[in-house]
Amino acid sequence: MLLRFFINQPRFIQFTFLRNKKDRILGLQLGKQPFRMSSSSGLKQQGLAQKKKFQLEFDPSSVSKNGTKTEAKVVGTEFGVLLVRARNTYFATAGKCSHYGAPLAKGVVTSDGHIVCPWHGACFNAATGDVEDTPAIAALRTFPVTEEGDGSLWIEVEDKNDNGASVLQPEGCWRNKATEVYNKGSVETEVTAPHVCIIGGGKGASVAAEYLREKNFKGKITIFTREDEVPYDRPKLSKSLLHDISKLALRSKEYYDDLDISFHFNTDVTKIDLAEKKIYCGSDEKPTESYTKLILATGGEPNKLPIPGLDSKNVYLLRSIADASKLAAVTTEAGDKKNIVIIGSSFIGLELAVVLKDHNVSVIGMESIPFEKVMGKEVGTALKALHEQNGIAFYLENSIKEVKTSSNDSSKAEHIVLKDGQSIPADVVILAAGVKPNLRYLGNAVSLEKDGGVKVDEHCRVLGAEDVYAVGDIAHAPFAGLPSSGEKSHTRIEHWDVAGNLGRVAADHILFGNKAGYTTKSFTPYFWSAQGKQLRYCGNNAAEGFDDVVIQGSLSDYKFACFFTKGEKVVGVCSIMKDPVVSQCARLFIKDAMPSKSQLKENFDVLSIPL
């Protein structure tokens, strides 16, 4: 029970009666701050929302054992929830993934209570709703479940959230854990207070910063970014040329302000003094900030080919919102179809080919089959055929001899001449020749790998640099190269999901790494791509390579799962139209429970393996 007395508003005195489980008053608490959490009666400071109980309608046989789930209808409403059976009890959560809204009932659930999204592998805790693996950043709302004597299940629901919407509606079914835990303005301001600086404004940076606050870290957090925007959903750039920050931002600037996360926008870090723990920006001779812990999350920068003419005004890159805006503008101008030449048959290059397929699109690549190194000859050939069905022309096993500029405008490319003599007309040229790690600001302070990345340990600590971590595209991390054998190999993975998970790894070690017996939580690298069909992939072919591919399903119908093997071990899995196979395999890798190559050749169903 709560009584509040207001004296000369807005000052007030708050009294709280403390009760035991039998509702007997045990004492009186005097507090100076307004309460934020709902009381036992369900009353809230704003809206006086009332908790209600709703019966669930579902098929009992669908949740008869641990590791099962179903979509349950909330009787008396138009909504549903995900009902999970795990750890010999029932859990109810929001039914859609907080990443892109995938139906979680079509994903997978483990017997110990992990919910995995069928589309992109985001993982949630069934009991708490907390995010355990990215790409999701918002937690699921959970609902207490009670079982009545007649076997019926009921959930307890607070009918309104702080925004006045039903918590069962899509806009109300997710939670932001960090703002629930951290109170704005509680950051420590002493000179000796801890200060985590993060260089880079991508997914790894955003996840690391938010995770620190989610665990109630009260030191300073500062993010340095070259861009003038908060971190945003970069994969959408190549999948749609979306360039509206309001639709791309992972979080609003106000959200970061509420977490006391500071930004240096439009800022280029040029030097780091590792000995003195100081960061220098631009041409400044004085350090901009000092840090106690540093996370490097600067990602990659596009490769530029040393060919005259590729600096023409109609040659475009795609790495930022500004790039997407320029490319969207030039490809939607009124007029006839444009001749668009994409240099590079990478995932991003061919995602752009899908977006621009209404134009005359040509793709130049050095390999004989797109994606062969990662996906194998069979899958690469099938994807190439799919693009050709959409009118995309390929010029493979080729390279650029020269770029011919317009006779009317020497600053504009007009034709791309290939080494075999073919000439391709070009109104728009897109350079999609991959990226390289952006670590110039380190100078010679740290030894780099051959490809320009930096080596880290299992906690993302940079080897040879005290209190420095690296995540994302720049980090050579010890991923599971052969997951089923437990072996590990350092490799650099340029995946959005990996960047986010490494950000969590680094932040977690900053907070808890000094505790006895500390270990880093494992995750399986997960990747997706829009290639005219939705392609999912998990594993790590890049670390160890593969020597065979087991195909289940039909490549020609684009409904298949492919298992990449080395010997009898599976090192990676991809699928199209076979959800949730890849999400299931992501968990099987973690549990060291993947079937063998021989089993898969006998058409063994990985979905039959209990998690």
UniProtKB/Swiss-Prot annotation:
Membrane topology: Peripheral membrane protein
Gene3D superfamilies: 3.30.390.30, FAD/NAD(P)-binding domain, Rieske [2Fe-2S] iron-sulphur domain
Cofactor entry: FAD; [2Fe-2S] cluster
Compartmental location: Mitochondrion outer membrane; Nucleus
Family label: Belongs to the FAD-dependent oxidoreductase family.
Role noted for this protein: Putative FAD-dependent oxidoreductase involved in the resistance to cercosporin and other singlet oxygen-generating photosensitizers. Translocates from mitochondria to the nucleus under apoptotic conditions, where it degrades DNA and induces apoptosis.
Protein name in UniProt: Apoptosis-inducing factor 1
Organism: Schizosaccharomyces pombe (strain 972 / ATCC 24843)
